[in-house]
A protein has these predicted regions:
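Flexible interhelical linker loops that connect adjacent transmembrane helices
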Residues: 1-22, 183
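Extracytoplasmic gate region of multi-pass secondary transporters
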Residues: 13-51
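Transmembrane alpha-helices of Major Facilitator/SLC transporters
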Residues: 42-65, 69-72
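Small-residue-mediated transmembrane helix hinge/kink sites in multi-pass secondary transporters
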Residues: 57-59, 112, 142-147
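C-terminal transmembrane helical hairpin of 12-TM major facilitator-type secondary transporters
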Residues: 66-110
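A late C-terminal transmembrane helix in Major Facilitator Superfamily
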Residues: 117-152
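Multi-pass alpha-helical transporter architecture, strongest
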Residues: 154-185
Length: 185
């Protein structure tokens, strides 16, 4: 019946399954990196990156950008690659800021995509889908990070791989769906 179909998609938006997968991959990589580099400076710098992304998203050109998620993922990938390159003072300041900025930019773009793919009456379902996938991905990332704490480089390689897969998926989604609606914050 019609009432049963509403009950089935109350917590998860089926049309947003690929977007939810991308969100879970992004937050899983965040969880892995956060568990491998657990210092106050690193975590504070990631939060500063989140804040800078929130400020940048007030600029319409960034908020409505078609490949904002791919750009955010690329920034996070660059941050992880530079963490691999060599250890220096920037490992606890600038690199995590870049990582946090990229993760926040990409995650917010995915939320806008979820909200844009639903009807007005399904906005709370889209938000539930976002939080289920982001919290689930973060949990899996933290669990994987704690399992891999003895091998920091391999944990970061896994996080890097997750971000690459997320970038490919979100870029393909944008290329397949040529017409993208304006986002509303």
């Amino acid at each position: 019946t019609k009432h049963d179909s509403l009950k089935n998609d109350y917590e998860f938006l089926p049309r947003g399954a690929t977007i939810a997968l991308v969100i879970a991959l992004i937050t899983a990589s965040l969880g892995i990196v956060m568990t491998t580099r657990l210092t106050i400076e690193f975590c504070t710098s990631v939060m500063v990156g989140f804040f800078l992304a929130a400020c940048a998203l007030h600029i319409p050109a960034i908020r409505n950008a078609r490949f904002a998620s791919a750009v955010g993922n690329t920034l996070a990938i660059i941050a992880i690659l530079t963490m691999f390159a060599h250890d220096d003072i920037l490992d606890s300041t600038l690199k995590p800021m870049l990582f946090g900025f990229g993760i926040a930019l990409s995650s917010s773009e995915q939320l806008y995509k979820l909200l844009g793919s639903c009807d007005h009456c399904q906005r709370s379902t889209a938000e539930s889908t976002y939080f289920l996938s982001s919290d689930g991905g973060l949990f899996l990332g933290i669990a994987a990070g704690w399992q891999l704490t003895t091998a920091v480089k391999s944990a970061e390689e896994i996080a890097l791989g997750l971000l690459v897969v997320a970038t490919i998926i979100c870029s393909l989604n944008v290329l397949i769906k040529k017409k993208q609606a304006k986002h509303h914050a």
